[in-house]
């Protein structure tokens, strides 16, 4: 293009020489630099009081590290995110679901905001250092040969640690050197490469200067537009700078940019001034206003107050600059994006200017340490800087390096950002899910479980009302709907090996049967039960039944063990529960579903049944990856066996590589339990769905949601939006699951009574292989 005319050599404008160590980089000005990546805080789900408190903390941090030899740069790099978590699935349904969902997600424009803060230590700002620098120049020492002293390195490392600790609420860490495929790469160089060429890629450590390594794209400057040429494409950029500062600042003035539908780099720098220099600057400004007979006496008084605040160490002063570089693949699109960006930047009252003659300087001023290129700068307070750079963002989750590996699922946030969902928060994967009927809870829980199949876990699903039956069967699992009056296929006396541990369990289980109506047993009867279990273990496997067990007891006593066992024997009113020909819990299957809805209100059957089921499930918690899902778990919590299981396993299952997921319609259901505290404490991942009837006490006081999070759940999020709140630790985000057009998959993820009957009919005709019956199900469902 004709307007593109000037091209520069990297060493002329890029000041970075080499790594001093894994964290520290040396500049040709003798400055040292470290860079931190910051997760940020989600302003969208935080209370105003929380944001104001963070603003004050940030101002305090800036005051604590203030030194005229220190400078800070903050960057927000907004970029397209196209990475989708790839995996293999153990069921064809999960694989097909993922394939369709992936096509939907990669077709959308998702953007992420990467936040960075760079710390620079400039020893030349010290008077003695300036003198040393003068003699160095006299000796014509080459910049690349100047060696930083150990004291300067120690100082910047110390300051970096202070900054990391001060930014704890924001999740900051130092960029470093890392190995990949046997080669060393530099995270700092990758960050700087984005500033130089607007593109992200791996940058290896080399023997040459960092400057020459990171300048891999040609940057050509026109009058108002920058062209960046890469071997495979070209991009265009335009820049804005602040011409006049707003009269007041508040946290979040630039937050509108964080949801913009284009890529950009927002750069800010803050070079600390000494108190003496700050007093001179502010005094000069005050005198100018007085001499000009400025009518705004309130501004003069405000400067008086500011000088007093400066002397009282309520803030520090620094030289600040702000620029915004906007990127597009075509000049026409760039013009559109720049128009939108201008609106966001002027929203806070600042006067901005499109860079033209100063375009090249503005571009290179984005690089930390290029102080002389900052053409548009002004003195502001640390409170102002904390407001202009508040490290606001949206959580994006974690793509790689999770306890079980790659992210479970990619979701879209309310802000159009990607969110890489994981059940695990740290090493704890227990999850609490809460949403009223019709909120989309079932679809989303089952979708996440289908995505979890990529990690090849054993999955145990305790269902209610058979809502997950189609999903379990389609996912290659075995499903056992336990119905009143129908043989359960459960025979505990045949299902367990007669080890000493298991015999103790079986004794207690038999005690449960013979005391179901409130009876008691004598010590002699306890011993009789123990002897009977021992004797039963000597029989052939096929003969180990309740009917056989009864024969070991005295049947002459009207209230004895034999009589009490009678009703549990085959042919009697409860014989269908446990006195079956074989024990078939499907524990050899990787995906198991049980529906116990019929028994939840039948305590007599529920107690021994759950006692046995959860004891057998314990055998699966042996170090393999496992998730245990319990729908409407509050009902199960009425049972002592489940309550004990939940309380113990919630605390210990992570050590055995497992996790639990509890789902319910109302938080009060969980809160009414005696183990409510354990559930809240041991489920760091919590998912809440819209609920117009949400109770403030339940959500805010008991589950510790912020008032803003409660507001979202109660009033802002609608059921139709299919949006929900994910909270992990203190961080939260509003995400959505868009399965529009995927009607076949939705019919599997959320089963209706009609569809469940249809599936069972088809399975009775064609067998249980989902690869065979699932296509027939979709065909018949559509024809209905």
Curated annotation (Swiss-Prot):
<dbReference type="InterPro" id="IPR027417">
    <property type="entry name" value="P-loop_NTPase"/>
</dbReference>
<dbReference type="InterPro" id="IPR043964">
    <property type="entry name" value="P-loop_TraG"/>
</dbReference>
<keyword id="KW-0472">Membrane</keyword>
<keyword id="KW-0843">Virulence</keyword>
<comment type="similarity">
    <text>Belongs to the TrbE/VirB4 family.</text>
</comment>
<dbReference type="GO" id="GO:0016887">
    <property type="term" value="F:ATP hydrolysis activity"/>
</dbReference>
<dbReference type="InterPro" id="IPR004346">
    <property type="entry name" value="CagE_TrbE_VirB"/>
</dbReference>
<comment type="function">
    <text>The type IV secretion system VirB/VirD4 is a major virulence determinant for subversion of human endothelial cell (HEC) function. VirB-dependent changes of HEC include massive cytoskeletal rearrangements, a pro-inflammatory activation by nuclear factor NF-kappa-B, inhibition of early and late events of apoptosis, leading to an increased cell survival, and, at high infection doses, a cytostatic or cytotoxic effect, which interferes with a potent VirB-independent mitogenic activity. These changes of HEC require the T4S coupling protein VirD4 and at least one of the effector proteins BepA-G.</text>
</comment>
<dbReference type="InterPro" id="IPR003593">
    <property type="entry name" value="AAA+_ATPase"/>
</dbReference>
<keyword id="KW-0813">Transport</keyword>
<keyword id="KW-0997">Cell inner membrane</keyword>
<dbReference type="Pfam" id="PF19044">
    <property type="entry name" value="P-loop_TraG"/>
</dbReference>
<dbReference type="InterPro" id="IPR051162">
    <property type="entry name" value="T4SS_component"/>
</dbReference>
<dbReference type="GO" id="GO:0005524">
    <property type="term" value="F:ATP binding"/>
</dbReference>
<dbReference type="GO" id="GO:0005886">
    <property type="term" value="C:plasma membrane"/>
</dbReference>
<keyword id="KW-0547">Nucleotide-binding</keyword>
<feature type="binding site">
    <location>
        <begin position="435"/>
        <end position="442"/>
    </location>
    <ligand>
        <name>ATP</name>
    </ligand>
</feature>
<dbReference type="InterPro" id="IPR018145">
    <property type="entry name" value="CagE_TrbE_VirB_cntrl_dom"/>
</dbReference>
<protein>
    <recommendedName>
        <fullName>Type IV secretion system protein virB4</fullName>
    </recommendedName>
</protein>
<comment type="subunit">
    <text>Interacts with virB10.</text>
</comment>
<dbReference type="Pfam" id="PF03135">
    <property type="entry name" value="CagE_TrbE_VirB"/>
</dbReference>
<keyword id="KW-0067">ATP-binding</keyword>
<keyword id="KW-1003">Cell membrane</keyword>
